[in-house]
Design a protein with these regions (language model features):
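Structural recognition of alpha->loop->beta junctions
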Residues: 98-106, 163-184, 189
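Flexible glycine/acidic-rich beta-alpha junction loops that bind and position SAM and/or redox cofactors
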Residues: 62, 117-122, 151-159, 175-232
Length: 279
């Protein structure tokens, strides 16, 4: 059993070019860490549950630091997972060690791309060196990882997409790390995303909604830079098949919480041995 909890509403970053979350959640709000810890304790006692899944779009690092310290201080024996944005501040001091000691066993990252030009175009505010160091620390600590990847972001070339795929498939230590998983999604332009307001900046034009999709919140469009829609579709189909042969995938976001149960089931035996082999 894995129960959902919420530490914050909306997204503290709110700058990603592809994201419509600010359109849905106008104001970002973060809860007091102490109140969230109390939720953990209440739910643990009421439902006899020790596994929790943060539903946040991106957990703020300062919140996590306070939350983890409080969990440890009060000796709350739980395991949890949640979604983070790659941040340099996460790598400061012993913050990742603190997360592990508080029960963090899997972190979900919106990597989107392992190409710096594409990340900059996405307005992610992420440097590849942060990705590398975060992944390395997670593997050493025994924190499993999940990566979201995007195929076909406007202006993206085939070679740039392959940078992301090869980052995973050429990294055997990452592939062998317990509980690692990834999902590749085809880019979808949604209403309210920053790209909608200035499509020319991302090399797209003629945004439209097909009549048969009149209730859709997404757009179809034409590209002027990078791959066209046919090339994107073909590449995407090839890559999801390729990834599916090598990487654990999950069909729905919230099934990622099941990864906690997998790790808990195996951690007494093979997990420790596999971590030793990765060192």
């Amino acid at each position: 059993r894995v129960l959902p909890v919420m530490g914050s509403r909306g997204c503290y970053w709110e700058k990603c070019a592809f994201c419509s979350i600010p359109f849905d959640h106008m104001n970002f709000h973060v809860r007091y860490a102490e109140n969230v810890v109390n939720d953990f304790k209440t739910l643990q006692k009421k439902y006899n549950c020790n596994h929790f899944f943060f539903t946040d779009e991106a957990l703020p690092i300062n919140f996590l630091r306070t939350f983890a310290a409080k969990i440890i201080e009060e000796k709350v024996d739980v395991q949890w997972t949640g979604e983070l944005k790659f941040e340099k501040s996460l790598l400061k001091d012993d913050r990742m060690d603190l997360l592990y000691k508080s029960g963090c066993r899997k972190l979900i990252f919106g990597l989107e791309s392992y190409n710096q030009r594409v990340l900059d175009s996405m307005k992610k505010g992420v440097e590849l060196s942060w990705v590398d160091e975060t992944a390395e620390r997670c593997m050493k600590l025994g924190i499993a990882m999940h990566f979201y990847l995007i195929c076909g972001f406007p202006t993206e070339t085939r070679e740039e997409v392959m940078d992301s795929i090869n980052f995973i498939l050429d990294n055997q230590r990452l592939l062998d790390s317990p509980g690692f998983s990834a999902i590749l999604s085809q880019f979808d332009l949604e209403r309210g995303a920053p790209i909608e307001k200035n499509p020319a900046e991302w090399g797209i034009k003629n945004l439209y909604t097909p009549p048969e999709h009149d209730l859709s919140l997404g757009y179809s469009y034409e590209t002027t830079i990078g791959m066209n829609s046919e090339e994107i579709n073909e590449l995407y189909q090839q890559l999801i098949e390729k990834l599916g042969r090598e990487v654990m995938t999950f069909p729905h976001n919230y099934s990622l919480s099941d990864g906690l149960l997998y790790l808990a089931h195996h951690q007494r035996n093979s997990l420790t041995e596999r971590l030793g082999a990765l060192a």
